[in-house]
Amino acid sequence: MKITADQLDRATGCGASTAGLWVEHINGSMARFEINTPERVAMFLAQVGHESQSLKRLVENLNYSAEGLLKTWPTRFTAVEAKQYARQPERIANRVYANRMGNGSPDSGDGYRYRGRGLIMITGHDNYAEAARALALPLVAQPELLEQRTWAAIAAGWFWQSRGLNDLADQGRFERITLKINSGYNGADDRAARLEWARAALAGA
């Protein structure tokens, strides 16, 4: 099923001009990756709307305050360390994403190089590499390709289908979808609110 720019605007709160820039890219991705029922579409739009701040941010925001670091990564920073790292996105990424998801040590720079990008925030070397193989894109060498609307949308659809999120949408398991995307329940209230926006937009309410 295809959506209109007006439905996309109402589903994500992105504004009419932004919806016009995105609608064909998102429709193309949803068609390619079988996001093709009202509930699949609603859940997809709710999740990517949250992750991309209403389709307006395609790179992860890591500009955390000390307080934000302690709240988001309480086991990775002491209070003293949080103050030392605050408002330094590159240092933060290289620390919190080091030695996992296929990334190297903090000194490798992989954490920042493979920080979240695209509509669903693909994160980590291994996820970029998997997407690269699936989509035939040089994402390991050029991760910034996911900052382009076409690939941001395609990669989000690929991630959604490859992680079994269409099946979870069919089962109504929205919170489980959040866990698959976020590895936690960050922003659960906003995601839930966006799901209602999307359902209303698709229903024509």
Describe each PLM feature range:
Residues 17, 33, 50-60, 166, ...:
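Secretory-pathway/luminal and periplasmic proteins that interact with or process carbohydrate-rich
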Residues 11-42:
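N-terminal carbohydrate-binding/catalytic regions of secreted carbohydrate-active enzymes
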